[in-house]
Amino acid sequence: MIPKCRCSAGGLADRTPYEEVVLDTMLYSARLKENVARQNSAVIVAMARLIASTFEDGGKLLLCGNGGSAADAQHLATELTIRYRSSVERPALPAIALNADTTALTAGANDLGYDVVFRRLAEAYGREGDVVLGLSTSGNSRSVFNVLQYARGHGMKTIALTGGDGGIIKDLADLSIVVPHSGSADRVQECHITIGHVIIDLVERLLGYSPSRK
């Protein structure tokens, strides 16, 4: 039986085990984000500068990931192409989530093998001067590794957001951030999406659009 919340007029009299889970989880996530921010603030700014300058030069941002990281890639691409915050008016910015086209993904996986699907799409959409951003909570996604490797060999810049020890992807990217958490993907993904949001905010500022409210 699930324990009921025991409350008093002044608030919680004491916490249930489930409330402790809430507190522990959210505080750990907050501390992890703080640690990542303190260790990587300059790298995050460098990522934003790279993306902003790419847009200014007429290039585009290609993003990719698998599972929850695929959702993050689509999330961030949409906020660049459509809108991040309603307080900033700006043109659409060219960002494509390579994992968004299920027909292309399934055809590529069936005909070529899943590990090369993102690479194949980068062959179609990527051009010299573009940026490829790969997300992998373990850093060991072969499909992300392959597209970053292709991008580097074809005049594109590369960014990686990973977790754990960074895996095989960390040293392949021009700019990378490793979220120091292993054992589960959820906390890493929470950091990745926050990093992505900060990058978008900075890109808008660097391109001269009105600062977003917090």
UniProtKB/Swiss-Prot annotation:
Q: What's the cofactor?
A: Zn(2+)
* Catalytic activities: 2 D-sedoheptulose 7-phosphate = D-glycero-alpha-D-manno-heptose 7-phosphate + D-glycero-beta-D-manno-heptose 7-phosphate
Q: Which GO terms describe its biological process?
A: carbohydrate metabolic process; D-glycero-D-manno-heptose 7-phosphate biosynthetic process
Q: In which pathway does it act?
A: Carbohydrate biosynthesis; D-glycero-D-manno-heptose 7-phosphate biosynthesis; D-glycero-alpha-D-manno-heptose 7-phosphate and D-glycero-beta-D-manno-heptose 7-phosphate from sedoheptulose 7-phosphate: step 1/1
Q: Does the keyword DNA-binding apply?
A: no
EC numbers listed for it are 5.3.1.28
**CDD domains associated with the record:** SIS_GmhA
Report one GO cellular component: cytoplasm
The entry marks the following residues as binding substrate, namely 66-68, 79, 110-111, 136-138, 141, 189
**MF GO annotations:** carbohydrate derivative binding; D-sedoheptulose 7-phosphate isomerase activity; zinc ion binding
What is the recorded function of this protein according to its Swiss-Prot or TrEMBL entry?
A: Catalyzes the isomerization of sedoheptulose 7-phosphate in D-glycero-D-manno-heptose 7-phosphate.
- Tell me the protein family, please: Belongs to the SIS family. GmhA subfamily.
Return the protein name: Phosphoheptose isomerase
Source organism of this protein record: Chlorobium limicola (strain DSM 245 / NBRC 103803 / 6330)
